[in-house]
Every structure is written in C-alpha cells, then in structure tokens.
Amino acid sequence: MKTIYILLTRSGTLLSNLVYAVTGANYTHASLAFDDELSCLYSSTRKNGYTMFPAGPSREYLNRGVFRLRENVPCALYALEVSDEAYARARRRTEHMMAHGRLYRFNVLGLMLCALRIRWKRRRHYFCSQFVSEVLEKSGAMELPKDSTLMHPNDYTKLNGLKCVFQGRLADLPQRRQMEFDPEETVVSVYLGLAMGLLRSGVCRVREIF
C-alpha cells in the first residue's frame, strides 16, 4: 500500500476570494502529492506560481509562488491509502499531463458553474478539484460521490477513506516548516521579476517579426 496526499487551501487570491464569496467553503483549492514530504504538488492552477494566468496542469511548491507569499492561509492535509497499482497509475497520469501541459487549459467556466452546482465538462480543461478528482477516479484510487466537474475542494473533507493528518495555518504545516526559503523573495521582487520576464518576451517576439 502507498499514500497519496490531498492538500486543501484557501489562498486568499482574487479567484479564491471569489469562490469563497459564492460558496462560503473553508477551502477553495486542491492539490495532489505523492510523497510524505510534499516536495512537489500537482494541480490545475497558475503556471508561473504567482499570476492568475496562464493556468493549467502545473507543479506547485510550498516554498514558492502563492504558497510562499501567503503562509497564514487555512489548509488541511488528507492522506489516502491506495494499492501500489493505483498509486502508479495516478502518478503516471499526473506526470503525463504535466509533460503535455501545453495541450491543457484551466476550466474557468467550469469552476464558476461548479460553485453553482452546474455540471460543465470541456475536453482538456480542468479546474483544481476537477483535476484531482479525475486523477484519483481514473486511476482507480477512489470512487467519487459525484461527477468530477461538481467536486469542490471542500468535498474532500467529507469523503470516507481520507484521513486528516493536519489542519491549521499553512505556515504550521510540518512539511513546509522543514523547507528552505529564499529570504530575498518578496511580493515586490516577485512581481518585478515577472514584469521583466514579460518585457523580455515581448522584445524577443518583436525581433522575430522584424
């Protein structure tokens, strides 16, 4: 038997606050992890770790991106015991989506409709909890109580078979406390770096045209 982890958070970003305003749920984001240290998380989310878009299947890290800058947000960590075969299938499916991330998009409309309990499925489009749900269901790791397009992060707090191993502030999550952080990384430095990256990208595209 092996363990798959599901991390639930409410990051306090614009999109998170919008979902929270509509649903009132404790958690608005879901991620998967395949190791006890949570060294790498997987979800359908912001691809650069900071800005809302571009978004799609992406890796997340507890000491980078939004998780680095918003450490006081509420979170809950759940453990799911699965067979070795289901674990391997879930990990293989996840890594495949990461490797072909350019083929996938973030399911913005689906996320909004999920909050209203309306099913909306579009090929290769996923929001966070839909991504987590499909990986777990299609790998045979667990059965869902409803369609993946209707699974909200908060639904995982009510599922049988999941064990809550931590609940509290993200800053107090044991795995995060063991990680190293870049002391120079601040909100200002992050967004300045992103702005410079966009500027360089724009300059390169202009050069390609001419």
Regions found by a protein language model. Give the residues of each.
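Cysteine-nucleophile amide-bond enzymes
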Residues: 1-210
